């Protein structure tokens, strides 16, 4: 019996060690995306003022993008895939510190600040942003394996027309708007606000979606640009390290 207890204790200790996360510091766990995926283009919206808040967001110290090592590795595969089709990836946001999410929450609570309404949420009253989950106190971005992005056409040297802008608050941003993302079938239709997207715009969204899903990412049902690594390494951890270039 004593030997059995000792064996059980040893096994428990081993399993406990096996559950220890591979990386122990932020700098070890994350990489600067352009170091891992050199072909990407960055337009970090929250470093500038052209975003739904209208200000630079807290925690964005440099116009760069960070991801966990695992997510960056998968994104490199996506990049290679779309390059073979004539595109590059363009990133709007990746890892987002908790202080940035807190900034969103404070902004959403200020009903008087509607500076950017006409550009990002013209059909919504700001008071519904919480109840409709456009703004939340926690974000998957803060776990470090989520990225917001689009496609850039290498032939035209322009963003691919997706029929809607990044961070548009409305049904027009949903992957199933005007089509079935599971089958890729375009169905047409109009939103409650009378908007629509063309078949080509829907198919452009599907090109991005397929490339991301083929290489280990999962989509969000309310944003065509938002993808999270399926096997994200820190599913319960919300980081607060600022966004800035990391040492290689």
Report the location of each language-model feature.
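Positively charged n-region of N-terminal signal peptides that target proteins for export
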Residues: 1-4
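Hydrophobic h-region of N-terminal signal peptides that target proteins for export
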Residues: 9-16
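Intrinsically disordered, low-complexity segments enriched in polar/charged small residues
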Residues: 7-8, 231
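Conserved metal-phosphate-binding beta-hairpin within the catalytic cores
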Residues: 227
């Amino acid at each position: 019996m004593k030997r059995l207890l000792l064996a059980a204790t040893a096994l428990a200790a081993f399993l406990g060690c096996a559950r220890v996360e591979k990386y122990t510091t932020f700098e070890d766990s994350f990489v600067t995306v352009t170091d891992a995926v050199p072909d990407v283009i960055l337009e970090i919206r929250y470093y500038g003022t052209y975003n739904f808040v209208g200000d630079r967001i807290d925690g964005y110290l440099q116009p760069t993008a960070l991801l966990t090592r695992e997510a960056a590795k998968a994104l490199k595969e996506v990049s290679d895939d779309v390059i073979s089709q004539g595109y590059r990836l363009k990133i709007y946001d990746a890892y987002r510190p908790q202080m940035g999410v807190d900034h969103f929450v404070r902004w959403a609570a200020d009903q008087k600040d509607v500076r950017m309404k006409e550009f990002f949420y013209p059909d919504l009253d700001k008071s519904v942003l919480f109840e409709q989950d456009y703004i939340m106190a926690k974000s998957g971005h803060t776990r470090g394996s989520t990225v917001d992005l689009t496609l850039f056409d290498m032939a035209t040297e322009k963003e691919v027309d997706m029929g809607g802008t990044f961070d548009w608050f409305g049904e027009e941003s949903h992957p199933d708007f005007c089509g079935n993302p599971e089958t890729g079938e375009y169905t047409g239709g109009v939103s409650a606000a009378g908007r629509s997207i063309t078949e080509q715009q829907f198919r452009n969204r599907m090109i991005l979606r397929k490339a991301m899903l083929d290489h280990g990412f999962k989509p969000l049902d309310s944003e065509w640009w938002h993808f999270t690594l399926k096997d994200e390494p820190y599913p319960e951890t919300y980081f607060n390290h600022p966004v800035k270039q990391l040492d290689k």
